[in-house]
């Protein structure tokens, strides 16, 4: 059991206050702080005493990961745990399946495109299912809304320039229709795209400001989000995705699980995110980074996503999120001096503190203290530690394992 130094990522959409306030560092921070990575991804591995976790694992993979994990996933940690702080909307994006990632990575490797080239879509051959758990109110767009519901919104919006495209949707073949509609919109020439975005912006602004009785609350929230996206990315056709995707306003402790091919864009808030150990992102707009619409469309799932909220299973101090994959497990725990967390997996684990102060102790005398934003690495070969809140207080921990 050793302290794990997270790798800070300073993307433009990050927040100057969310991570800083959680960690107790200078706030506002000098630059937007977007993510704090706890894992062994080679793009930004966490460190232990200045040495990358990926290197530590490579020294003795079976001791670090355990026989079961190595036999199933190879000699790499199969998950990446993050703190994610969105101060501005993230890009409109999706992630490939394992099969798609392997093929895409091999294709780009064979083409000679450098791994660090900004045009690169596939940074590794891994899929990237992900779970986000809100620590603050957290807004997100995720998965296509059933089009019967979207049709209600478009009827109230009544934007003629948009209606000419949405008329192509056939309720009898919603999936194929959504594919055609989305592909058409994100492929519009720049001039036509800007004109359409501005027309919808005008219509949306009138509705949001006047709030007529026919505008349901959920419609108001979607249109308000659209206006925010247009303000952040003027003329970006990706903003129109807000009209097609489910809108979620998560409260602390609530979560979303997104499998491969699910279109999404996180908007605002602080959360704990866990995913397969990948940095593959296919973008369709709302970003200054590389956008590859044909590749994004190729991996997208256009069926409606009706239930991205994962089920949970209560445990002694919180709950575990029940997920349909083997790459990672995540549970949330609220501790006191009496209510403790015992790490029992036969594989590796990372324990992250998000509030209060906690202390861990293991057979043999190893101890550690955790404050918000701090984590410990527990290799498979180490004695199994137990965590409790310090000094009679309370603490919240997230326990990631395989």
PLM regions and their residue ranges:
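Short acidic-glycine-tyrosine-enriched beta hairpin
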Residues: 247-258, 262-266, 272, 362-383
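A short beta-loop-beta micro-motif enriched in histidine and acidic residues
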Residues: 31-33, 76-77, 87, 126-128, ...
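Transition-metal
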Residues: 1-213, 288-306, 330
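Conserved short histidine dyad/triad with adjacent acidic residue
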Residues: 314-316, 326-345, 372, 381
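A short hydrophobic beta-strand segment most commonly corresponding to one strand
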Residues: 90, 131-137, 269-288, 328, ...
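C-terminal, non-catalytic macromolecule-binding modules
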Residues: 269-320
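Generic C-terminus detector
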Residues: 88, 357-402
